């Protein structure tokens, strides 16, 4: 079992927290992490691209000239693809780029990125993040007290709304809960700031 130092929100040591090796101490599987990140990035694509095919463009219902006798090539519509202003052939249509991976793969990727952060000493555990009201300045003081000045993902327990509201407006700070933190967010962050309650929830879900 791995031990990490537990801090309070003033930056003082408040003891040790024992992490479950089944979640935070595995050998990271880089290929699985890669696959999940590609999947999550694909899901972020809007997919709203669209063009008009010959049935969608305006006009072109009448045959421009008779079939025979003019000496010109036969045409059925001025909105055929070979005409200027005609419909596009096989153009992009709105669609979702997202696809799902098996749950076991997604869970292995989560455990891999968590384990990597712990191994690299980029995992900061805090006993609680308690605020009586949303105060961005107060959360900035917490980060300063914990010597966190780089891109950080704050992982909270469910229902800690004041902490989430206090953190969300700070630059380089992203907020998630124990159940919504994604592999992409964790991998993109320089450090993780995780509450003790969130650690328990992560272990409950992934162990």
Curated annotation (Swiss-Prot):
The keyword Chaperone does not apply. GO terms for molecular function: rRNA binding; structural constituent of ribosome. Part of the 50S ribosomal subunit. Belongs to the universal ribosomal protein uL4 family. One of the primary rRNA binding proteins, this protein initially binds near the 5'-end of the 23S rRNA. It is important during the early stages of 50S assembly. It makes multiple contacts with different domains of the 23S rRNA in the assembled 50S subunit and ribosome. Forms part of the polypeptide exit tunnel. Keywords: Ribonucleoprotein, Ribosomal protein, RNA-binding, rRNA-binding. Residues 49-78 are annotated as: Disordered. It comes from the Bacteria. This is Large ribosomal subunit protein uL4. Pfam families: Ribosomal_L4 (PF00573). InterPro entries: Ribosomal_uL4 (IPR002136), Ribosomal_uL4-like (IPR013005), Ribosomal_uL4_dom_sf (IPR023574). GO terms for cellular component: ribonucleoprotein complex; ribosome. GO terms for biological process: translation.
């Amino acid at each position: 079992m791995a031990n990490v130092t537990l801090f309070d929100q003033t930056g003082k040591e408040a003891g040790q927290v024992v992490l479950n090796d089944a979640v935070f101490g595995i050998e990271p599987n880089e290929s699985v992490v890669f696959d999940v990140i590609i999947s999550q990035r694909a899901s972020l694509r809007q997919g709203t691209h669209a063009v008009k095919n010959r049935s969608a463009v305006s006009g072109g219902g009448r045959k421009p000239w008779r079939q025979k006798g003019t000496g010109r090539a036969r045409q059925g519509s001025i909105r055929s693809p070979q005409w200027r202003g005609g419909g596009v052939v096989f153009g992009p249509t709105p669609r979702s780029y997202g696809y799902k991976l098996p749950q076991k793969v997604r869970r292995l990727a989560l455990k891999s990125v968590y384990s990597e952060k712990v191994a690299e000493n980029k995992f900061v555990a805090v006993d609680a993040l308690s605020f009586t009201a949303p105060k961005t300045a107060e959360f900035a003081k917490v980060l300063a007290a914990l010597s966190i000045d780089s891109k950080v993902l704050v992982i909270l327990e469910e229902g800690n709304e004041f902490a989430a509201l206090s953190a969300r407006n700070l630059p380089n700070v992203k907020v998630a809960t124990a159940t919504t933190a994604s592999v992409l967010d964790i991998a993109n962050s320089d450090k993780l700031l995780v509450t003790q309650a969130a650690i328990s929830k992560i272990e409950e879900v992934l162990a």
